[in-house]
Amino acid sequence: MKIAIDLTPLYGRKRTGVEMYAIDLYRALLTSGNLIIPIFHVQNELDDNPNAVIIPESNRLLLENIKLSKCIRKIAPDIVLFPIFPPPVDLKWGFKGKVYPTFHDCAFLKYRKTLNFAAKYYLTPNLLAELKKRLKISIFLWRKSCASR
């Protein structure tokens, strides 16, 4: 199975909990026996994986909304993981693989005033769209499990 993992947010960022989670997930995936394709921005700071894809330096808005989804479509993985930031909104068009975002918390819903511009207008809409999809799936599965009792 071909699995891509978005590690583009690692470039130029301080390593906090979400970044460390993404690195740990990536390293665990390497032991899975699957073809793992890490996607980096500017450089691979983690290892010498020959399957790594490096997106050249660009504006973060352009990277997260156009270049990343174009790169993923070109790779055509069966699964793509987003362990740090949500997937680009346009990824749903023309991509046949499965998309798995990571929800670290929902503080962005309650504390919107504390968010910077990028978080308000990039993260929040993307996370809400993904969360809405996941909630529909969860409710459907919950109802299905209740009906089978």
What are the residue ranges of the model-derived segments?
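Carbohydrate transferase catalytic cores enriched for Leloir-type hexosyltransferases
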Residues: 1-149
